[in-house]
Amino acid sequence: MKHTFVLFLSLILLVLPGCSAEKSSADTAKKTLTIYSTMSTDSERDTFRKLAAAFEKEHSDIHVSLHFPGNDYENMMRVRMAANDLPDLFDTHGWGKIRYGEYTADLRDMKWTQDLDPNLNSILKNKSGKVYAYPINQAKDGLAYNRNILDRYGIAPPETMDDFIKALRTIKEKSKGSIVPFWFAGYDKSSFAQYYDQFATPLLITDPAHNEKKQLINGTFQWSKFTYLSEILKQMQKEKLINIDAVTAKKSQLIELMAQNKIAFTMQGGTLGQDVAQINPNVKVGIIPTPAIHPGDDPIWIGGERYTLAAWKDSPQLKEAKDFIAFMARPANAKQMAEATSLPSGLTNVKADIFYANDYEYYQDVKVEPYFDRLYLPNGMWDVLGTVGQELAADILAPQDISQKLGREYKRLREQSETQGAENNE
């Protein structure tokens, strides 16, 4: 009996390695497609995961490995670029041509490129026709505002900086200080960087009489011409037109404060409107284009791609990477992602039902200008813009000091950067 049991156990042990090897072999046969994205909200990530799972069902030989590094994304990608070991697919977050261009596969032969929104051509294509990335959505940044407050005080959505300042003063006066006219989440310096970057375009680009494009490109721009934006921001702070805790306020506070009708304007877009509506459906959040600064100029959207999928040109799974992009570009899938991010699709054949759809339709004839830093500033200047904004609000630097610092950093970063934002028209 004992002999029989030992023999049986031996047979089991002989069979198990075979089963294990068979399973291991099946797993090994699957190709892993690694994807890195800058998506930040749960709704965005959940929808992306859902679509990735659907792709896996159609491609049983492929496993999709999604990664959302958050604030570590850029540093992680810099390390991987230095090692020439990029993910199979990755998010170019506005730097498809400038920073990642030499690493990306050309997608021009893919079917969806026929429906690429022309507003994205200057950002995602070069003169020879190379397409650097697939735009999951596109940004149209302006000013988010509380419709209830503007209606209550009889204020029309401002179209110029002068009108904007007047609106802020009216809100402060009529609310007796109970409402923050213009709210910043300055604990995250990107809040101030967004202000500078967004208003730099109407200040220095769109008005023909004040066009500094050539000077910004060739490095001769006089940064004293940038001082206006710091002066206006400081003026707003002195008049208490922005929140007194602008340097320490966090983004996590925004939704609740807006839902309580305590904020009139902010520069946060994305899912803000729908997030506020979930807390307080009676609060109506809208979005308007960035006001003009110079007399006679028009408001503009500041935009470009928000989330993208670029394929690493040296990826051993390049075919599979393109298959995934083609899957994401199907109209039904592209619509899902656009709606999850509450932004328009990057494709003209996709009409998404997003929160700000009526606003975008109302302002459909307003021109979209690319993000200022992506075209005219060297890599690294975004962080500098955010830092000087914090220093201005904390009374560490005066407006003129900020312009001098920006000039020094602009020169330094141009010299150390191999490619400049202004030199991306290859």
From Swiss-Prot:
KW Chloroplast (keyword) present: no
Lipid-linked residues (N-palmitoyl cysteine): 19
GO cellular component: plasma membrane
Biological process (GO), any one: polysaccharide transport
Residue numbers with lipid attached (S-diacylglycerol cysteine): 19
Annotated compartments: Cell membrane
Signal peptide: 1-18
Taxonomy, superkingdom: Bacteria
Induction trigger: Repressed by the transcriptional regulator MelR. Induced by melibiose and raffinose.
Gene disruption: observed consequences: Deletion of the gene abolishes induction in the presence of melibiose and raffinose.
InterPro entries named in the record: Bact_solute-bd_prot1, SBP
Membrane topology: Lipid-anchor
Keywords, comma-separated and alphabetical: Cell membrane, Lipoprotein, Membrane, Palmitate, Polysaccharide transport, Signal, Sugar transport, Transport
Record Pfam families: SBP_bac_1 (PF01547)
Family: Belongs to the bacterial solute-binding protein 1 family.
Function field: Part of the ABC transporter complex MelEDC-MsmX involved in melibiose, raffinose and stachyose import. Binds melibiose, raffinose and stachyose.
Subunit details: The complex is composed of two ATP-binding proteins (MsmX), two transmembrane proteins (MelC and MelD) and a solute-binding protein (MelE).
UniProt name for this protein: Melibiose/raffinose/stachyose-binding protein MelE
Gene, per the UniProt record: melE
